[in-house]
Amino acid sequence: MSTNQETRGFQSEVKQLLQLMIHSLYSNKEIFLRELISNASDAADKLRFKALSNPALYEGDGELRVRVSFDETLGTLTISDNGIGMNREQVIDHLGTIAKSGTKEFLNSLGTDQAKDSQLIGQFGVGFYSAFIVADKVTVKTRAAGETQAVLWESAGEGDYTVADIEKATRGTDVILHLREEEKEFLSEWRLREIIGKYSDHIGLPVEIQTTEYNEEGKASGQKWEKINKAQALWTRSKNEISDEEYQEFYKHLSHDYNDSLIWAHNKVEGKQEYTSLLYVPAKAPWDMFNREQKHGLKLYVQRVFIMDDAEVFMPNYLRFMRGLLDTNDLPLNVSREILQENKITASLRAALTKRALQLLEKLAKDDQAKYQTFWNEFGLVLKEGVGEDFANKQQIASLFRFASTQTDSSEQTVSLADYVGRMKEGQKAIYFLTADSYVAAKNSPHLELFNKKGIEVLLLSDRIDEWVVGHLTEFDGKPLQSITKSDLDLGDLADKEQEESQKAQQAEFGSFLERAQSYFGERVKKVVLTHRLTDTPAVVSTDNDEMTTQMAKLFAAMGQKAPEVKYTFELNPDHQMVKKIADLTDETEFNDWIELLFEQALLAERGSLENPAAFIKRMNKLLG
């Protein structure tokens, strides 16, 4: 008998997600059972944790398990647990809304490409709502541990759901799926055993199925519950016993990801510290990767008792994409997030797990370049944060970076710093790089002309974070990183001695011209000089080593911060016909117009924009007319 019944509307995002999910994930519809058993397992973990301080929550029933049963006559499939359960408020919070920030933006990003959308929805984590892939109605009966009032939740997965108070003798949750007519394949003991064996063998508590007992004459004599999984936490088993398929299914259980992971590491450490870790590298970035408020981290167990999800303290922020768990004997069972923050054991575990994660990425890069490229394309921007956050591991982190380069003639970031160092020319002392807004802008920068002529490789950096990265990563393998856009560029032994002598002679020849140009610009430029870094372009602008670069100024602006004004050195190519022509001009107005136009062209090539483009166009039209 139900009382206090009310009908409530779904949060709008739930309705949209349900419709998209039913259509996008239908081709792999059996995952609904994995998701519901996984939720039941989590409910058991949470009860164990709460019962540490309040054993009465067990209510005399400490044998935790998940039970799967079906009724062919009613067309229902039921997944039951005796875990933590939910009260009315929790039911409304968990089953009527999606408590994830940015959900609306995520849903708006979905389009009409079903294959792509199914991957995105898989990254989002389908959870309880996956029941609607096969059911046209879902009924939930639940009672929270330690409470007397039970709750009924029911919905057809459309606009609303019903909540009511009911009686329920046992704690925990029953999820009853009223299967669609075309989904009756799941009303089969054989089919259910197959799915549970495939997806849930690793669950750390018994998964039982209702099966028929037969007497000696072969006639059905009743029903019994039979455990059909190993019921041993996967990470406590020997690595030699665990198949790749089991590791992958456990990853999906942990992360609620729809895709396989790229690689994993399962380690048991004994000695001064005792812990087991299981770390995974995902294949796809979650949709909210750059949401700093989104929780991340490892699942924490102490002595095989679940303590918390998203224990972020064990993994640095730049490795927030890592998934997995830590099971340690070195922390107390009553550990809290606050205690973790101030704990020496935590700091030691964090250092060890960070090393383990970086070694796992190194192994992936060494053993499977294609998979590593997949990783880099998804998570490279996040990993780059590490050079500013983790001084102790800076060189190891940098060795994992990949860049575009003049050597590959491709925008794909495939070149490591070790690759670059291995190809350095004899006498080359620095790793040369160029930062720009895009690969195309970098590839066509006039700053490359001299390097292309000499066949010197240059790394092309076009991610917004790159200028910040090279500010923290000043050297690699003993070789300094040097920007080729600096006015005090030094090629060392690679410099052309004859050209240097020629430049000295031209300096005298163009001396009055340079003074004239400097007089015109005044304080607008730091200085006007001749350059031999150009072959085809008449002029460029550059900055000194100790001054803010164009890209860093743009980064400040993107963060809403005011950056110091960038004052450029204006470099002119004395071998270019346009520069020679301007140097010969005697009319002051004409000279000023031409030298200004040249400066604006150089600024446009460097910054991609001008403060006053209309004036630039007017001046160009005037000089062309």
From Swiss-Prot:
The keyword Ubl conjugation does not apply. Its main location: cytoplasm. Keywords: ATP-binding, Chaperone, Cytoplasm, Nucleotide-binding, Stress response. SMART domains: HATPase_c. One of its GO terms (molecular function) is ATP binding. PROSITE patterns: HSP90. GO terms for cellular component: cytoplasm. Pfam families: HATPase_c_3, HSP90. Residues 338-554 are annotated as: B. The keyword Membrane does not apply. Residues 1-337 are annotated as: A. InterPro entries: HATPase_C_sf, Heat_shock_protein_90_CS, HSP90_C, Hsp90_fam, Hsp90_N, Ribosomal_Su5_D2-typ_SF. It is found in: Cytoplasm. NCBIfam families: PRK05218.1. Homodimer. PANTHER family: HEAT SHOCK PROTEIN 90 FAMILY MEMBER. This is Chaperone protein HtpG.
